[in-house]
Regions:
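Intrinsic low-complexity, intrinsically disordered or marginally ordered coil/linker segments
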Residues: 1-119
Length: 119
């Protein structure tokens, strides 16, 4: 079962631009293993649009999802920079420092920063 959760991609974000993101906790029903994943896209007008897409996908795999909060990601692939900032009106502010740690594992050669700035 452990490998199934490991198979879920930790990060799925747009390759370029500024867009909303959410931090989602996956958990096996009844506790047990859990992990946090980052999802973000320009296609989402609101943070809950991202959650409404990821939640059924994860439920199919047998996980419960909880949104830990949201914010924005500014992804500059040319300069290899990612900035995490802002918050979600509906879900509150994600712990951006957690998000950055997850992003650093995927984008190893990037400069990744975060702040509580709104813009």
């Amino acid at each position: 079962a452990g490998s199934a959760m490991a198979a879920v991609r930790a990060v799925e974000i747009d390759p370029e631009g500024t867009f909303k993101y959410i931090l989602v906790r996956l958990q096996r029903p009844g506790g047990g293993e859990q992990r946090d994943i980052v999802r973000g896209t320009k296609a989402a007008e609101f943070h809950n649009h991202i959650f409404e897409k990821v939640n059924p996908e994860m439920e199919k795999l047998g996980y419960e999802c909880k949104c830990l909060g949201g914010g924005k990601i500014e992804h500059n692939s040319k300069d290899k920079k990612i900035r995490v900032f802002g918050l979600s009106t509906g879900y509150g502010k994600a712990d951006h420092s957690v998000t950055v740690e997850i992003l650093k594992k995927e984008y190893t050669d990037y400069e990744i920063t975060w702040s509580d700035d709104k813009k």
